[in-house]
Amino acid sequence: MTNKRKSAKPLEPAKRTPKLRTKKSRDLSASESSCDFVKVTRAGLHSRNKHQGRYDFAKLTQALPSLAPFVIKNPKGEASISFSDSTAVKMLNKALLSAHYQVANWDIPAGYLCPPIPGRADYIHRLAELLEGEVKGTFPHEKVQALDIGVGANAIYPIIAICDYRWRYTGSDVDPKSIESAQRIADSNPVLQGQLELKLQDQSQHIFQGIIGPTDYFHVTTCNPPFHASAQEAAFGTQRKLDNLAANRLKKGVTAKAGSQKISKNKPILNFGGQNSELWCQGGESSFLKRMANESERFAHQVLWFSTLVSKKDNVRPLRKQLEKLGVRSIRVVEMSQGQKVSRFVAWSFMDKLQRGEWIKLRG
């Protein structure tokens, strides 16, 4: 069974979703409001993450023999690849998906984001943990309906969630080429068939509107938002990462000159590549998050938990304050650290614990 690409249609004008708050709560300060706020910090990869420790290149090259020419020795004599080589990084991803997720047919068009899989997997596992906290006993993951905003050409979040938890996913994107690429991946891998539906968001000013229909319900949404405010800013950010990577290689005794690889603002290269819609939007990440929060209110009763990665730590507090103004009943900030790298996601629900329990009983 394969999925047809669907072009999103504008929703009919709908009545404003009633806020799940009382008049009294609107008069309370943020610290006194009825919003349940919890921040947690998780060190290291989730115990269910398949990518613990160093990559097993013997296993990976067995799964994908074409990775072998890209395997090198680092100064410690350990097997690795050059992470500044876009082809090597893509081959590593292909091998990881084949070896650990039974996704043997995966590819992305040139210039599109090639995501680091271990960190992406942790986002999914922490969200699964959030859902499991809603029930006593075993959570019915096979009944989960999830929505990925900005699925990209790589479809990485649906792949991980479908293969590890059998969630059913809807992926949306404003870029037709990304939708086409994700559809090819879904159609060419039996493990994904019938589990992933792709929708083109043809209203770029909207996030959920035009994607969530009147009869749609989702247990969770995921998103890796664009975090730059312009193409030029995105290009500078990419170059900075390349320079840092080259400097790190020099420190480890590998000959490479920082800044020796330059990019143009229109053509980011290497594993830090990406199309405009993947990298930047007007106003940057903070503006995108505010739009997402505001638009989520309209679908307060149709989504159990909204969530998004937040790249810049300084954007967490404004997002929290905005959500509290909207009458959100529960907010979770989950910080995930792997070595020196720290990432985080914010999840929110317009329902309290009791209401979420009833929602799950109705929809599984």
Curated annotation (Swiss-Prot):
For the protein in the UniProt heading, the enzyme class is transferase
Membrane-spanning residues where? none
User: Does the record's keyword annotation contain Phosphoprotein?
Assistant: no
| Disordered: region residues | 1-28
A GO cellular-component term linked to this record: cytoplasm
Q: Where in the cell is it found?
A: Cytoplasm
Answer whether the UniProt record assigns the keyword Cytoplasm to this protein.
yes
- What's the protein here called? Ribosomal RNA large subunit methyltransferase F
Organism of this sequence: Vibrio vulnificus (strain YJ016)
Q: Which gene encodes it?
A: rlmF
